[in-house]
Amino acid sequence: MATQDSQGIKLFGKTITFNANITQTIKKEEQQQQQQPELQATTAVRSPSSDLTAEKRPDKIIPCPRCKSMETKFCYFNNYNVNQPRHFCKGCQRYWTAGGALRNVPVGAGRRKSKPPGRVGGFAELLGAATGAVDQVELDALLVEEWRAATASHGGFRHDFPVKRLRCYTDGQSC
């Protein structure tokens, strides 16, 4: 696509000309790039893990800016930026970035909550019969009295479920 002439670079049908200053700066940059690999090779011998230290999590424990607790832990780098390490306080359960503002996360957020224990027992456990404090005779007597009151008010028959009237249509009239 790009071809270089003595006048400049031809790119997409348009010729871009060089000034004398631009060509000199390009030559200087090329010379600096040739010198930099030599410098990088010497620094690599001195500290082979210099690149790894930038990605490594911080070792220093930072106190929480809200509750001043030292029970904090490093979580991750915010937006994958090594200049913004994100921390979590176990005391007040808040996230914050070092040197940044404290996030307003409600207490209890940021941790997995345990599931509530399932109900093992049935009706007797709800009434407190698991302790043995409720007499079965009193419970039976209350149920019998309630049954008798309900049957008396409904003409001798207790309706536990609402009855839906069936409709059958023959010639437009209901049965």
UniProtKB/Swiss-Prot annotation:
Polar residues bias spans: 37-52
Stated role: Transcription factor that binds specifically to a 5'-AA[AG]G-3' consensus core sequence. Acts as a negative regulator in the phytochrome-mediated light responses. Controls phyB-mediated end-of-day response and the phyA-mediated anthocyanin accumulation. Not involved in direct flowering time regulation.
Organism (species): Arabidopsis thaliana
Keywords, sorted A to Z: DNA-binding, Metal-binding, Nucleus, Transcription, Transcription regulation, Zinc, Zinc-finger
Sequence motif Nuclear localization signal, residues: 162-168
Chief place where the protein resides: nucleus
Sequence positions that bind Zn(2+): C64, C67, C89, C92
GO annotation, cellular component aspect: nucleus
Region (Disordered), start-end ranges: 29-57
Induction (free text): By red or far-red light. Circadian-regulation. The transcript level rises progressively from dawn and decreases during the night.
Single biological process term from Gene Ontology: seed coat development
GO molecular function ontology, one term from the record: DNA-binding transcription factor activity
One matching Pfam family: Zn_ribbon_Dof
Zinc finger (Dof-type): 62-116
Descriptive protein name: Dof zinc finger protein DOF1.5
Localization, UniProt: Nucleus
